[in-house]
Amino acid sequence: MDFSKGHGTENDFVVLPDPDVRIDLSAPRVAALCDRRRGLGADGILRVAKAGALAAAGVLAELPDGTSEDDWFMDYRNADGSIAEMCGNGVRVFAHYLRSTGLETRDEFVVGSRAGGKPVIVHSADGSAGEVTVDMGVVRDLGTSAATIDGKVFNGIGIDVGNPHLACVDAHLTAASLSALDLTAAPGFDPGFFPHGVNVEILTRIDSGAVDMRVHERGVGETRSCGTGTVAAATAALRFDGADSGEVKVRIPGGQVTVALSGGRATLRGPSVLVASGNLDDSWWNGLS
């Protein structure tokens, strides 16, 4: 079984081309493949197939809004095997993979996701490095809530970017004090507010057009970056300063991306890196439940 490995600001993925939708992505198999000791290691899996093929195979009950049968669809799975609606870094890597392998020849096209079709612009793409802008669509305010991180309570805003986020801006945080926080344990949150779990971002306020952010992703743990999380963070940071539009550079442990918000919609621009390709041993894969 062929695979590629890539990352967007060190949020890393195993890419599995599966045009005929024959790969059984059971939760235990996904978890084993993403395990950094017994598998390839990754924050998630990106299955590459056309939306129509996934619908015909029963993976999708229906085509999400803005997605046609002929669109390439990012079937995304978290490291624990759970299905996720959307992954901004994943879309960049997915689009880069399509262009670098020749599966897609256009620089502008739509990537399907469970959160709807996501138009992308591939600014550059070769066998290893790419730069991609993703139209992340509508950003929705869910109201205020709070997270408990490292024994401290941080107030934040619930934000829907195709998946749920709780973005907490703290005016007293510096890059150094943010780095010192312990995100080993999952942050506490209100399960009544977020019944299906939530991705939690903690960040500094805007300074010279930029913020520093860390993220704990549901089903994964702390990651080096989270694309939808950077959009949520930029949204929360702008609102903290009384604005609802603007451009914010978001610095995460894995690098930097640029988020632009206007009219309630967001775009995300950042790098993608393809680092390896190879073949999974069939006996190992088939031996997994």
UniProtKB/Swiss-Prot annotation:
Belongs to the diaminopimelate epimerase family. The keyword NAD does not apply. One of its GO terms (cellular component) is cytosol. GO terms for molecular function: diaminopimelate epimerase activity. It is found in: Cytoplasm. This is Diaminopimelate epimerase. Catalyzes the stereoinversion of LL-2,6-diaminopimelate (L,L-DAP) to meso-diaminopimelate (meso-DAP), a precursor of L-lysine and an essential component of the bacterial peptidoglycan. Keywords: Amino-acid biosynthesis, Cytoplasm, Isomerase, Lysine biosynthesis. The keyword Protein biosynthesis does not apply. Pfam families: DAP_epimerase. The record marks 165, 217 as: Could be important to modulate the pK values of the two catalytic cysteine residues. Pathway: Amino-acid biosynthesis; L-lysine biosynthesis via DAP pathway; DL-2,6-diaminopimelate from LL-2,6-diaminopimelate: step 1/1. It catalyses: (2S,6S)-2,6-diaminopimelate = meso-2,6-diaminopimelate. SUPFAM superfamilies: Diaminopimelate epimerase-like (SSF54506). It comes from the Bacteria. InterPro entries: DAP_epimerase_AS (IPR018510), DAP_epimerase_DapF (IPR001653). Its EC number is 5.1.1.7. PANTHER family: DIAMINOPIMELATE EPIMERASE (PTHR31689:SF0), DIAMINOPIMELATE EPIMERASE, CHLOROPLASTIC (PTHR31689). GO terms for biological process: lysine biosynthetic process via diaminopimelate. The lineage of its organism: Bacteria, Bacillati, Actinomycetota, Actinomycetes, Mycobacteriales. Substrate binds at residues 11, 78, 88-89, 163, 199, 217-218, 227-228. The active site is at residues 87, 226.
